[in-house]
Amino acid sequence: MAKRGAFSSFHSFLIVLLFLNSVLAVTHGHQDKQVYIVYMGSLPSRADYTPMSHHMNILQEVARESSIEGRLVRSYKRSFNGFVARLTESERERVADMEGVVSVFPNKKLKLQTSASWDFMGLKEGKGTKRNPSVESDTIIGVFDGGIWPESESFSDKGFGPPPKKWKGICAGGKNFTCNNKLIGARHYSPGDARDSTGHGTHTASIAAGNAVANTSFFGIGNGTVRGAVPASRIAVYRVCAGECRDDAILSAFDDAISDGVDIITISIGDINVYPFEKDPIAIGAFHAMSKGILTVNAAGNTGPDTASITSLAPWLLTVAASTANREFVSKVVLGDGKTLVGKSVNGFDLKGKKFPLVYGKSAALSLSQAKCAEDCTPECLDASLVKGKILVCNRFLPYVAYTKRAVAAIFEDGSDWAQINGLPVSGLQKDDFESVLSYFKSEKSPEAAVLKSESIFYQTAPKILSFSSRGPNIIVADILKPDITAPGLEILAANSLRASPFYDTAYVKYSVESGTSMSCPHAAGVAAYVKTFHPQWSPSMIKSAIMTTAWSMNASQSGYASTEFAYGAGHVDPIAATNPGLVYEITKTDYFAFLCGMNYNKTTVKLISGEAVTCSEKISPRNLNYPSMSAKLSGSNISFIVTFNRTVTNVGTPNSTYKSKVVLNHGSKLNVKVSPSVLSMKSMNEKQSFTVTVSASELHSELPSSANLIWSDGTHNVRSPIVVYTGDFSQPSSS
């Protein structure tokens, strides 16, 4: 999710946040009609079944009207069964009780949640990186987002042959929208076209699969080659967001993309609220994608660092948190006395080091009674005549204030760990440095300063989890660890739409900088596609396992739950290692059915979701789903406990290999962990062997999870799985 209207609650970040807004309503008689999604599971296998006719018959039956014109909004008929309709509350209740209907839920509205990052992860340009060009060219990434700018050089088809034969999609991008042999498909689900008006969709698509484009920068900042993980792959774009991202549009995109023939789906969209799987459009669509061999990669969200803020919770999703790479952008402030301070900003304005007078917001108040609010640069409290031509100093910063008050630049206190783009030169300083500016301002008769153009700095402490990245634990399935993985989401330079100005004016740029889990999500999706180019027959769960078990381990950068596995899952994605994991944890569709039964879904609901006769005679507790990580929530603290995890691994490394287990306790952990058997001898490829992990302790810390890592090693491969045991009651943070 990026920030700037998509998993983004921040000024210039786009992340696709799923906001629950009011649903569409049409007045009819004494009851309002609202738009509802009627989900009916998989399509029946009968040759004579016509989905739309069935959907119309249902509407006629419940509406009890001679005409139902305008009632049916859309039908899902390609990859799963369902429809969207305008219903009264009583009609909704009747539909929900009908045979064959899994769930009926309101059509919510969403908003969107953004290269050095690939070099940082070892996926470098040129001959040093192993590639499988022919398979990569046959790989199709489906991008569910706000559209795309098709003319971007990142999506040029120079050197590309025709689309893969498996492609069954179309180019329905609208008027003056042209696809090519790189951008092979486009659809949109609202009036208009598939063009991107915010820059978010263009940005995410180029991160995952954009061409290598040399000499790109944001006004000279971050100059280099921008590229995706799999630049030879194809892109199909599904514009599900046009202002908001509606549930019905997302389900339509899944319905189309599955039938179109995509290999990976990246969706930097999410909700700020948690819903059960049968009412979550991303979970529903991704389940059907998984059953057809397609992995869905989803942004974790940008509502951190609160615990239990993550909403991408289904185990068949690869849920991606956001972390730093080894590059960030800074904007220095040089005070009149020569002192230099380093702040955060993506500042493309070059004032050539010229110093301008400083004015503190409080000193520019319209009146004495407004001095307090002027400290925060509240617009209605500032006298524009006292601000014009000066550098405005604010306790906090509202991006448009300094611009509208005609300041030449701005300095403000900013404790965040990410930089924003603004419409004039700014620098956000940490508290101590900001206090230095105030002290200098008060001590000088004519205080002045210069705000310098941003520059890149590189450092060795990456990766670190970012504060805005949504955290676990999982409040739907407490024994499934979320997020799964983390990837770069800080200040990512990628392609931009020429309909979208980073300054919210007419200054359009071809490449821009964004931050958020919207940016980390396509990084992970690109890695998934990269892995698939070497293992085209691997299932979604095998690809997911390879990414998770080869991840770089992460260390705590903060205290509390916000800096544990609930922040970063298995660790930071490692593209090269993920192509050769040694062992994988595979989860079949049947396993997921047993998992849903173990969650007390009744067999009728599971059957309707799966389209198969499911008796629920087999149930898997979430703790024993063959997941690459292991997590258990216990009741109470300071108790003795024993928990077990049953797992099965498949050999994808080499035949005649012996894996020995090793357990590494994390700092402060008092867990006792036993693995049985402790040695796995694999004679052949694709051989499966099972083991049990038993975890015990005499007490648990009530404020922190206890964790360890299980590592299976044959001397070449190190297959690592986090083990997390925790207590405490968690609820989703308030969205207010």
Swiss-Prot record:
Record domain Peptidase S8: where: 117-579
Enzyme Commission number(s) of this protein: 3.4.21.-
Signal peptide region: 1-25
Chain positions carrying an annotated carbohydrate: 176, 215, 223, 555, 602, 638, 646, 656
Recorded GO CC terms: extracellular region
Taxonomic superkingdom: Eukaryota
CDD domains: PA_subtilisin_like, Peptidases_S8_3
One GO-annotated biological process of the protein: proteolysis
Compartments, record wording: Secreted
Enzyme class, spelled out: hydrolase
Alphabetic keyword roster: Autocatalytic cleavage, Glycoprotein, Hydrolase, Protease, Secreted, Serine protease, Signal, Zymogen
Catalytic residues identified in the record: 145, 200, 518
Family per record: Belongs to the peptidase S8 family.
UniProt-recorded name of the protein: Subtilisin-like protease SBT4.11
Organism in which the protein naturally occurs: Arabidopsis thaliana
